[in-house]
């Protein structure tokens, strides 16, 4: 009835809303690009940033217009995705304040970073379990839109925890536009997740550290010349990190071994990245240690006899 009174169609209203939603994503896309580039190049102008990053789907003039609209044309940076904006988008509260994380699937944290390949930038999204530091989901994309970044990463994470009741899980992020887009919020609502956002980057430190670990410890040391090679190397790097890399906060265990010992003892386990591992249970490890100790004592006695 209202549509007839206003002489507009329901389809036109939905199309207009889709345009607004896409613009909000693009605004946050531009804001993230400018913020990340200026972290390394504090005085770089928006035109130079555009030619450096060449964001897919956004031309130079629109990029500069968005920067002007966001107040990013000057060197002083302001991230519009950190606060309520004029379209009515409201940030979620930070649910991690004063929270003690004591088990897997209690809190997942996510962040998006970029990686340069032959002068072109691609985007990598990670989702980690805050307790075990396991990368439970990730994606590599050519664009920064929700359907290319956080949604495939979250779908991977949910698939990885298949059969586990995830209702009530806290999904924590930095408040970027992808994390409050309509599509993403519909997915988290369906999963009965609780959305959480931080105001400052250090309040999402675990997710941000994963960015540095994968990029600096792995990807920077690979010979990557294409998007396809980047995808392959991210797969490989995540497998190595999850299954083999010792973590000081996990008693020098890898995330997979840590989860195995404290959560899934007695069962096989496959971590994201495709590498299957079979770990000994506590009893077999004790028996193995006894054999090692016994052999060491025997060798020592033989050495003494030789002397």
Spans of model-derived segments:
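RNase H-like polynucleotidyl transferase catalytic core
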Residues: 76-81, 140, 171-175, 189-206, ...
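Acidic/histidine-rich, metal-coordinating catalytic segments
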Residues: 164-179, 204, 251-255
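Basic, flexible linker segments flanking DNA-binding modules
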Residues: 8-104, 254-263
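C-terminal domain-tail junction helix/linker
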Residues: 185, 189-193, 213-307
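Hydrophobic "anchor" residues
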Residues: 132-135
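Conserved, non-catalytic sequence blocks in retroelement Pol enzymes and Pol-derived host proteins
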Residues: 55-58, 100-102, 117, 175, ...
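A short acidic/small-residue loop/turn micro-motif
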Residues: 129-130, 140-145
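Mobile-element integrase/transposase regions
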Residues: 59-126, 151-156, 160-161, 166-169, ...
């Amino acid at each position: 009835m209202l549509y007839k009174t206003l002489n507009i169609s329901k389809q036109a209203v939905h199309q207009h809303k889709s345009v607004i939603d896409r613009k909000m994503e693009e605004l946050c896309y531009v804001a993230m690009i400018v913020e990340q580039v200026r972290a390394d190049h504090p005085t770089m102008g928006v035109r130079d940033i555009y030619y450096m990053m060449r964001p897919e789907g956004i031309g130079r003039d629109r990029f500069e217009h968005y920067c002007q609209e966001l107040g990013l044309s000057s060197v002083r940076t302001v991230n519009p995705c950190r606060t309520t904006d004029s379209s009515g988008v409201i940030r979620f509260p930070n649910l991690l304040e004063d929270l003690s994380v004591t088990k897997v699937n209690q809190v997942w944290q996510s962040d998006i970073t970029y990686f340069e390949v032959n002068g072109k930038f691609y985007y990598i999204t990670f989702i980690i379990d805050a307790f075990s530091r396991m990368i439970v989901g990730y994606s590599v994309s050519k664009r920064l839109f929700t359907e290319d970044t956080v949604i495939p990463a979250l779908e991977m994470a949910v698939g990885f925890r298949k059969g586990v009741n995830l209702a009530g899980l806290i999904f924590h992020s930095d408040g970027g536009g992808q994390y409050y887009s309509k599509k993403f919020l519909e997915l988290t609502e369906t999963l009965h997740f609780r959305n959480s956002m931080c105001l400052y980057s250090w309040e999402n430190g675990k997710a941000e550290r994963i960015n540095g670990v994968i990029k600096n410890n792995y990807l920077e040391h690979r010979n990557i010349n294409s998007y396809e090679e980047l995808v392959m190397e991210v797969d490989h790097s995540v497998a190595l990190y999850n299954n083999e890399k010792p973590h000081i906060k996990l008693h020098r265990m890898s995330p997979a071994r840590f989860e195995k010992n404290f959560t899934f003892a007695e069962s096989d386990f496959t971590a994201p990245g495709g590498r299957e591992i079979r770990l000994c249970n506590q009893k077999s490890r004790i028996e193995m240690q006894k054999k090692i100790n016994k052999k060491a004592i025997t060798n020592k006695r033989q050495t003494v006899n030789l002397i």
